[in-house]
Amino acid sequence: VSGVQLRLYPDVIKAFAMVKMAAARANVDCGVFSKEILAGIEGACREIIDGKLHDQFQLDVFQGGAGTSTNMNANEVIANRALELMGHKKGEYKYCDPHDHVNGSQSTNDAYPTSLHLRMALGHVRLVVEIKELIAAFRAKGKEFNSILKMGRTQLQDAVPMTLGQEFMAF
């Protein structure tokens, strides 16, 4: 649709891996599947968190539904890498299944919003830093253009004269 692939948003992919790893741990704690499967899933998730396998997330960022495509993409990438880490071939889902194991005890309506919330919670620190940099840039432009007089505008009409610097400082 947009031509923009999910792989261009590594923080979203990493958050998905964190959610899948936490769910796998909970499933083992509840006896849903074995520690061997958990080890494979954790290994795959750690690789994703470390920035690997992101090239396998080629879905468009805009998609129908409530994130089902993204959730299943994550499940399949994690399951296939987990299989390799466990000594099996990709697609040998009897050992680690994308739906039954990686997505075990979850739905898209659990995993997708949780991963997006996690991404926002983890990303806010960087956002604050970038906002502070933007504020500093506006202040610098405000000083640079403080002597350039221009007509102010309000309600699509001319208003009180102001400097271009004052306009930048308003941001």
Question: What function would you assign to each model-found segment?
Answer:
Residues V1-F171:
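Conserved, well-structured ligand/cofactor-binding cores
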